[in-house]
Amino acid sequence: MGTRTLQFEISDSHEKEEDLLHKNHLMQDEIARLRLEIHTIKNQILEKKYLKDIEIIKRKHEDLQKALKQNGEKSTKTIAHYSGQLTALTDENTMLRSKLEKEKQSRQRLTKWNHTIVD
């Protein structure tokens, strides 16, 4: 082999090496870009999932708020109803105690009157 052929092969080999290094850098850049794109897509998918989850939670929260409000209204009505019943029963109890006291007084008067007549 001649010097010229050897120089040509070295030059050709050097060009191939430079070309391969350039292609390697391009592929590494492409891989980095694709990884970033994959990462971005995964984040977008997660974001959509989280947004759906948030909407579901918002709806459940609204439903619970409505149920809580309805339960509060029912409790208020129930308390008002039982308060009315308690007031009515208290009034009736007061009236019956008064009647009982009058009956006791009448009985005592009758007993005294009977003792007065018998004596």
Curated annotation (Swiss-Prot):
Gene that encodes it: ANKRD36BP1
Transmembrane spans: none
Protein name in the entry: Putative ankyrin repeat domain-containing protein 26-like 1
Keyword Glycosyltransferase in annotation: no
UniProt keywords, alphabetically: Coiled coil
High-level lineage: Eukaryota, Metazoa, Chordata, Craniata, Vertebrata
UniProt KW Cell membrane keyword: no
Pfam families reported in the protein's UniProt record: CCDC144C
Coiled-coil parts of chain: 15-112
Origin species: Homo sapiens
InterPro entries recorded: Ankyrin_repeat_domain, CC144C-like_CC_dom
